[in-house]
Structures are given as C-alpha cells and as structure tokens.
Amino acid sequence: MTVSKAVECDEVYGIAGHKGRPEVVKKKGRQGRRRRLKGKGGRGTLEKERPPVFGMIQRGGQVVINLLANVQQKMIEPVIKATIVPGTRVYTDEYSIYAHLQRWGYAHKSVNHGQGEFARDDDGDGVCEVHVNTMERFWSLLRSWLRPHRGISQEKLPLYLGFFEFVHNVRKRGKALLPALIELLVT
C-alpha cells in the first residue's frame, strides 16, 4: 500500500515480552517480570523488549505500521521509500532519523515537541498544517486497544498490529468490508 498527499510519520515504543515463554526469559539471564519493575532508559529495541513500531498515516486516509528491530535511518529509509510516493509532504517530530527526508525526495516539515511545539501554522491562514497529531491519535487508539490484552508476546505482536491496521483502514467501508476481507485472504 502506498500513501501520498499529506503524510505523518511517527514511532512509538510498545511493551512486548516473551509472554508464556519462561525458557526465553531464563536464557536472557533475568527473572520474570515483576509489577512496577523499572525499565532501562533510552529508546526501545526488540532486545530490550520495547519494540519500536513505525507508523505512516495519510491525513484523512490509510495507515501503514511496521514493527522494526530498532529505529535508525537505515531501518526506516526502505520502509518510507516503499510506502510514501516521492514528492509527498511528510510531517514528523524533531527526531533525527527524519533529517534526510528531503534528500530522499520528500517535502519535509517537522514540529519540535522538545520545545513544546505540537502544531504550527506556516502560511498564516489560521490553520495549523504542521503537526503529527493524526499519528499520535492513532497511537492512542492502538494503546487503548492493546491494553485489555494485558501484555503481548513479541512473536504475536505483528499479528495484533496487522489486525489493528486492517480494521483502521477498512473502518469506513461498511458493507464493503466482506469483499475487502476476502481480497486480503486471497492475496
């Protein structure tokens, strides 16, 4: 699936351990999770059991999410190039992995969350065009949907993410959902 027009990119760090697999936990040389266990600081990776989920959402349209081993420019570049049409306006936060978007052929604008900037009006018409609030809203919906599952295995996380992406992308189809589901199963 490709997205175009105005696209927002962002990353979120989930919690996905080795639920139901105590042998994997012991192999890593640590005790099982305990309530209120303080984690390590910094950004997440699969090894730290804080897998990064990278998302791209077209404003008013489709979303594409990918589970990554870590978040680096070399990891997101092929994902972005395969998903976003060149020349598209891409909105991000200030994270340095997005620094080369213009070099890759995209019109890039960013907001600086670290400075308290969450939306910006660049053309003075009173509408804040530069923001990643659509993607942040999607992450909020995803977290709310995952919360009742009370922990997810790293092995199953891609299935949960794929299902939620599918549900989000077909939510407006109504009766056309069945043909879309059949098409997905056939391909």
Each model region followed by its residue ranges:
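Residue-level recognition of single "structural anchor" positions
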Residues: 1-187
